[in-house]
Amino acid sequence: MTELSALAGETDTGTRLDRFLSEHIDTLSRSRAKTLIKEGHAREVLGDQVRVQSDPKTPVVAGVTYTVEMPEPIPAIPEPEAIPLDIPYEDEHLIVVNKPAGMAVHPAPGTWQGTLVNALLHHCQGALPGIGGVERPGIVHRIDKNTTGILVVAKTEPAHKGLSDLFAKHDIDRTYVALTRTSPRPSQGTLETDIARSSNDRKKMAVVASGEGRHAITHYKTLETYGQISKTEARPAAAFLQCRLETGRTHQIRVHLAHIGCSLIGDPVYGRHRGIKATGRGEAFDRATDLARRLTRQALHAASLGFVHPMTGDEVFIEAPLPADLAALRRALSAL
């Protein structure tokens, strides 16, 4: 068991103990400090006097040393699984994964195996000092099970804290690409709404009135358009969009694009119809519309991630190419 300590100065007087420890010990997050204090791992040391402190709200006193014991991490509950991973970047602090479609990030009822966490536990065996006292990877964001692309994960407590701070401050550049039914008007802009659970279907999210949900901001730009809806309507049949997240709400891009009438091709939850509505004829037309109709997942890909490394200060930028199914659909749509 490791013991860490910090000496309180005059400017620290009156600060809550959990806040003081998290600010003076880099490896501790505020929530982790609070848990350790409540579990009796924090002590107040003044000369020969040592006293256990179990209240996170205890005000610190100048001249007193505060220590905290760091228990050994307990084994993770999810089982490690030897699942191949596409890893475009890894160092001692972080690992960046290009997640395939069909892989959930976290284990959950009905999906205890085959998740990204299971795969990372196997990949990082013996190299996870513990996040929150548990031997597990530090997941700070997630992408939907059937969305592909880039995800960054912390391997250590300090990196987890640093990444969490970056996401909280919106200092992460997250770019997605999407194939949509028809195209947005205007061709680029910002969607800013509140998002909450749908009152009609608790498994879905929905745009709600201001103040009734969580604030969500999506910036979008149309990169390509394909075909025409009908002979009488000149609007494109489909489009290839770039979307940049300023916030990270559940299903945010899917909900926002469906809200403006441009649902993702293949989206089984927010798409009203399978495939696309288009006019045309010939082999190229048939192939494009057939691929769109047969796509069994939302046409959404986390294409890139940019951030300042929380431990080294280096600029990190990782890209993932469009997966085969979406690349094939994009090529086919280009022939409309």
Identify the meaning behind each predicted range.
Residues 133-165, 173, 196-262, 293, ...:
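The conserved catalytic core of RNA pseudouridine synthases
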Residues 97, 255, 266:
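Active-site flanking residues adjacent to catalytic metal/cofactor-binding acidic residues
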